[in-house]
From Swiss-Prot:
<feature type="propeptide">
    <location>
        <begin position="1"/>
        <end position="8"/>
    </location>
</feature>
<dbReference type="InterPro" id="IPR018261">
    <property type="entry name" value="Ribosomal_bL27_CS"/>
</dbReference>
<comment type="similarity">
    <text>Belongs to the bacterial ribosomal protein bL27 family.</text>
</comment>
<dbReference type="GO" id="GO:0006412">
    <property type="term" value="P:translation"/>
</dbReference>
<dbReference type="InterPro" id="IPR001684">
    <property type="entry name" value="Ribosomal_bL27"/>
</dbReference>
<keyword id="KW-0687">Ribonucleoprotein</keyword>
<keyword id="KW-0689">Ribosomal protein</keyword>
<feature type="region of interest" description="Disordered">
    <location>
        <begin position="11"/>
        <end position="30"/>
    </location>
</feature>
<dbReference type="GO" id="GO:0022625">
    <property type="term" value="C:cytosolic large ribosomal subunit"/>
</dbReference>
<dbReference type="GO" id="GO:0003735">
    <property type="term" value="F:structural constituent of ribosome"/>
</dbReference>
<protein>
    <recommendedName>
        <fullName>Large ribosomal subunit protein bL27</fullName>
    </recommendedName>
</protein>
<dbReference type="Pfam" id="PF01016">
    <property type="entry name" value="Ribosomal_L27"/>
</dbReference>
């Protein structure tokens, strides 16, 4: 009588994969809402590239971050047909 026994207590490993990792989110997007009061230097919008363009009293940093250059109220506006901009107008 011939018996075919298989033992799995010392089975070889399953190898590795090229997947299995991910990077943390970069926390991009709007940091202040339309109509919100801001101070000089406040970050308004974090972005990669120019999704939104700087308007009145708004500067653009080296990483394309938009920030307030004066105290006032935030306004998200259309710029032409297919572009958007953010401006800061002095509070009355």
């Amino acid at each position: 009588m011939l018996m075919n026994l298989q033992f799995f207590s010392h089975h070889k490993g399953g190898g590795s994969t090229a997947n299995g990792r991910d990077s943390a989110g970069r926390r991009l997007g709007a940091k202040r809402a339309d109509g919100q009061t801001v101070k000089n230097g406040n970050i308004l919008y974090r972005q990669r590239g120019t999704h939104i363009y700087p308007g009145v009293n708004v500067g653009r940093g080296g990483d394309d971050t938009l920030f307030a250059m004066a105290d006032g109220v935030v306004r998200f506006e259309r710029k032409g047909r297919d572009k958007r901009q953010v401006s800061v107008y002095p509070a009355k």
